[in-house]
Amino acid sequence: MQRYPMTPQGHAALEAELKQLKSIDRPRITASIAEAREHGDLKENAEYHAAREQQGFCEARIRDIEAKLGGAQIIDPATLPKDGRVIFGVSVVIENMDTEEEKQYKIVGDDEADFKAGKISVNSPIARGLIGKSEGDEARIETPKGVVEYEIMKVIYD
């Protein structure tokens, strides 16, 4: 079974999404299909086909979430040693050594990642380049624009 690392917050968010899909979205889509069937000929019934497509997406997402929750490896950074190392679940402040621009990222599971909110996947190139390093260390990270060197300014265990 594949393991899916996630924070307790990420696990709770997936459970909430699953509950929404099963208790609200699935019944709504089923009702839409039943209503569209009443309109007659299913071959040329766009509403019916759209509702069936929605049902397919909904069921696929339910299966995906159930698989991830079943293989969830919940990692609470609050319970891990706070030794200044970059690990899953921490926030890290890095400085681009060329531009001196500072950025802060929180390293989270794939489903929690939101780059605009400063949350990066543990599987992203930046996170992979930072994991295991400590405050003051330098990291060479390969990006689409080439290799970028960062200095780890601070590790925050939140």
Swiss-Prot record:
<dbReference type="GO" id="GO:0032784">
    <property type="term" value="P:regulation of DNA-templated transcription elongation"/>
</dbReference>
<comment type="function">
    <text>Necessary for efficient RNA polymerase transcription elongation past template-encoded arresting sites. The arresting sites in DNA have the property of trapping a certain fraction of elongating RNA polymerases that pass through, resulting in locked ternary complexes. Cleavage of the nascent transcript by cleavage factors such as GreA or GreB allows the resumption of elongation from the new 3'terminus. GreA releases sequences of 2 to 3 nucleotides.</text>
</comment>
<keyword id="KW-0238">DNA-binding</keyword>
<protein>
    <recommendedName>
        <fullName>Transcription elongation factor GreA</fullName>
    </recommendedName>
</protein>
<dbReference type="InterPro" id="IPR036953">
    <property type="entry name" value="GreA/GreB_C_sf"/>
</dbReference>
<dbReference type="InterPro" id="IPR018151">
    <property type="entry name" value="TF_GreA/GreB_CS"/>
</dbReference>
<keyword id="KW-0805">Transcription regulation</keyword>
<dbReference type="InterPro" id="IPR022691">
    <property type="entry name" value="Tscrpt_elong_fac_GreA/B_N"/>
</dbReference>
<dbReference type="Pfam" id="PF03449">
    <property type="entry name" value="GreA_GreB_N"/>
</dbReference>
<dbReference type="GO" id="GO:0003677">
    <property type="term" value="F:DNA binding"/>
</dbReference>
<dbReference type="GO" id="GO:0070063">
    <property type="term" value="F:RNA polymerase binding"/>
</dbReference>
<keyword id="KW-0804">Transcription</keyword>
<dbReference type="InterPro" id="IPR028624">
    <property type="entry name" value="Tscrpt_elong_fac_GreA/B"/>
</dbReference>
<dbReference type="InterPro" id="IPR001437">
    <property type="entry name" value="Tscrpt_elong_fac_GreA/B_C"/>
</dbReference>
<dbReference type="InterPro" id="IPR023459">
    <property type="entry name" value="Tscrpt_elong_fac_GreA/B_fam"/>
</dbReference>
<dbReference type="InterPro" id="IPR036805">
    <property type="entry name" value="Tscrpt_elong_fac_GreA/B_N_sf"/>
</dbReference>
<dbReference type="GO" id="GO:0006354">
    <property type="term" value="P:DNA-templated transcription elongation"/>
</dbReference>
<dbReference type="InterPro" id="IPR006359">
    <property type="entry name" value="Tscrpt_elong_fac_GreA"/>
</dbReference>
<dbReference type="Pfam" id="PF01272">
    <property type="entry name" value="GreA_GreB"/>
</dbReference>
<comment type="similarity">
    <text>Belongs to the GreA/GreB family.</text>
</comment>
